[in-house]
């Protein structure tokens, strides 16, 4: 590319970062890295009424956990700082004034009550009220009152806004990297508010000014911002600046039904839609981190929501995603969020983890349950069951019988306990007690030799044997269980089963 790629993620700190925002950040990160560019984070907090304490720190922590931290942001490499819009508010006034002076904007003094009256009047006539060329010169604006009167009203502290003066009778033919050619009629656009009398710009003005001053080369954002594209392109024209290239990402859709995946869907349907847990007075919304997802799995899953590399490949490291990523392969249509596929990705990353690392995580769970087990034993157990798990948190239900004897026996499996079973189990105890090399392979060899020699069917012993140790017909290789729990515990559990069943 001819100029340096500089892309940004620019969230508003109005609450926890939704998974759709995370994907936007990820695609910006991948694009920047692919083109040896810069990915930066700008905090867009111009609407102070919606500001939520803790949200900014949450956004930064989430990106760090996911491994996609920005190179420039608040307090870090602020080359074009400040990177928080509320800290930049003094500079926006001059750009608003510039638009006034060049005829691209005007002052509007309409009160909320007056605007409401206009809306109601239009509704009564079966029309929709749009603040634009149709009525801007019939309203209380600097387009119809003198410059002296305008200055006097501002000096007297009267509330006003500065609105963009949208051109009339123009068809805008714009280019979007993902959607191709898009067309907008300026007569259908409203004159958006750019600046308020409290000295704060709206999103539209601050966004364009900052993208220009921070040398943003590409704006990669969600599809919900596509209707704002004509205004933003016109603002670049009004300032005489080159516009960046635009790419509008497809929506992430609900797993069932229609519409965009919302912040409420996760709690309602039982899966996380936030990278990290978010606590409020109303309750706790679950996060991927706290649910036991690996950040690499979340990144891999999100990358494939609306993009693929043109092959059937599904598992990508972050480095492989950077190498393969291409905005031209991002889909236009929305991508359905599949919670089961989400878990599948986590399973794929779990089974690739080092057994000892997983054992350390599992040891924390064991300690909470009152079990202190040598790490090498826990590591061996993990190696036997991790293929069956999506999360480390599932390990306990897959392994509880390694740590404690069953307190009950599966009713259906207990039907395998026949009249002759107790006698066979007592014989098995004798066989086990005489084994000196109590290792899985050796135990298996000796037990099977005993079965063959005495012409005893495998099912007559193996199923009751497993039921005695586990309490159900589940679990990894039976003789691995026997070795790990040891001879004494194995014999004790068989004796207990004989008494109970």
From Swiss-Prot:
Location of the protein in the cell: Cytoplasm
UniProt KW Transcription keyword: no
GO biological process terms held by the UniProt record: glutamyl-tRNA aminoacylation
Extent of motif 'KMSKS' region: 260-264
EC id: 6.1.1.17
Top EC class for this record: ligase
Chemical reaction(s) catalysed: tRNA(Glu) + L-glutamate + ATP = L-glutamyl-tRNA(Glu) + AMP + diphosphate
Placement of sequence motif 'HIGH' region: 11-21
GO cellular component annotations of the record: cytosol
Record carries keyword Hydrolase: no
Pfam families in alphabetical order: Anticodon_2, tRNA-synt_1c
Residues engaged in binding ATP: 263
InterPro entries in UniProt: aa-tRNA-synth_I_cd-bd (IPR045462), aa-tRNA-synth_I_codon-bd_sub2 (IPR020751), aa-tRNA-synth_I_CS (IPR001412), aa_tRNA-synth_I_cd-bd_sf (IPR008925), Glu-tRNA-ligase_bac/mito (IPR004527), Glu/Gln-tRNA-synth (IPR000924), Glu/Gln-tRNA-synth_Ib_cat-dom (IPR020058), GluQ/Sye (IPR049940)
Superkingdom of the organism of origin: Bacteria
Keywords from the named record: Aminoacyl-tRNA synthetase, ATP-binding, Cytoplasm, Ligase, Nucleotide-binding, Protein biosynthesis
GO function terms (MF aspect): ATP binding; glutamate-tRNA ligase activity; tRNA binding; zinc ion binding
Entry function: Catalyzes the attachment of glutamate to tRNA(Glu) in a two-step reaction: glutamate is first activated by ATP to form Glu-AMP and then transferred to the acceptor end of tRNA(Glu).
Quaternary structure and partners: Monomer.
Family: Belongs to the class-I aminoacyl-tRNA synthetase family. Glutamate--tRNA ligase type 1 subfamily.
HAMAP family: Glu_tRNA_synth_type1
Protein name: Glutamate--tRNA ligase
Species per Swiss-Prot/TrEMBL record: Flavobacterium johnsoniae (strain ATCC 17061 / DSM 2064 / JCM 8514 / BCRC 14874 / CCUG 350202 / NBRC 14942 / NCIMB 11054 / UW101) (Cytophaga johnsonae)
Organism lineage: Bacteria, Pseudomonadati, Bacteroidota, Flavobacteriia, Flavobacteriales
Gene: gltX
């Amino acid at each position: 590319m001819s100029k340096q790629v500089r892309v940004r993620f620019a969230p508003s700190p109005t609450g926890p970062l939704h998974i759709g925002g995370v994907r936007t950040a990820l695609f910006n990160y991948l694009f920047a890295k692919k083109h040896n560019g810069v990915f930066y984070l700008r905090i867009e907090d111009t609407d102070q009424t919606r500001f939520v304490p803790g949200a900014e720190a949450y956004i930064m922590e989430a990106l760090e956990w996911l491994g996609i931290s920005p190179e420039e942001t608040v307090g870090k490499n602020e080359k074009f700082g400040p990177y928080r819009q509320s800290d930049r508010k003094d500079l926006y006034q001059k750009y608003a004034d510039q638009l006034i002076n060049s005829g691209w904007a005007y002052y509007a003094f309409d009160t909320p009550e007056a605007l409401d009256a206009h809306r109601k009047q239009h509704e009564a006539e079966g029309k929709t009220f749009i603040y634009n060329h149709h009525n801007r010169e019939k309203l209380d604006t600097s387009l119809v009152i003198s410059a002296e009167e305008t200055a006097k009203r501002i000096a007297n502290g009267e509330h006003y806004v500065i609105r963009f003066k949208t051109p009339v009778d123009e068809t805008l033919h714009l280019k979007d990297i993902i959607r191709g050619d898009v067309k907008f009629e300026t007569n259908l656009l409203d004159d958006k508010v750019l600046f308020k009398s409290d000295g704060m710009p709206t999103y539209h003005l601050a966004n364009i000014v900052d993208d220009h001053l921070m040398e943003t080369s590409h704006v990669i954002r969600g599809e919900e911002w596509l209707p704002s594209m004509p205004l933003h392109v016109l603002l670049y024209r009004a300032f005489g600046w080159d516009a960046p290239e635009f790419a509008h990402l497809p929506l992430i859709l609900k797993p069932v039904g229609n519409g965009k995946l919302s912040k409420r869907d996760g709690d309602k349907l039982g899966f996380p839609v936030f990278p990290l847990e978010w606590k409020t007075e109303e309750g706790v919304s679950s996060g991927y981190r706290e649910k036991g997802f690996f950040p690499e799995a979340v990144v891999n899953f999100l990358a494939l929501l609306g993009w693929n590399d043109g092959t059937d490949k599904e598992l990508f490291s972050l480095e492989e995603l950077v190498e393969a990523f291409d905005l031209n392969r991002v889909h236009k249509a929305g991508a359905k969020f599949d919670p089961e596929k989400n878990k599948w990705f986590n399973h794929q990353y779990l089974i690739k983890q080092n057994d000892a690392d997983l054992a350390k995580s599992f040891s924390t769970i064991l300690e909470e349950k009152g079990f202190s087990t040598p790490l090498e034993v826990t590591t061996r157990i993990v190696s036997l069951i991790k293929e069956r798990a999506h999360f480390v948190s599932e390990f306990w239900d897959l392994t509880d019988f390694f740590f404690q004897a069953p307190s009950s026996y599966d009713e259906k499996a207990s039907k395998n306990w026949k009249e002759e079973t107790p006698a066979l189990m007592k014989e098995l105890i004798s066989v086990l007690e005489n084994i000196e090399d109590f290792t899985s392979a050796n135990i298996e060899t000796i037990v099977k030799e005993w079965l063959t020699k005495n012409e005893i069917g495998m099912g007559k012993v193996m199923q009751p044997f497993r039921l005695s140790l586990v309490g159900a017909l589940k679990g990894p290789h039976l003789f691995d269980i026997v070795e790990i729990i040891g001879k004494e515990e194995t014999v004790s559990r068989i004796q207990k089963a004989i008494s109970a069943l």
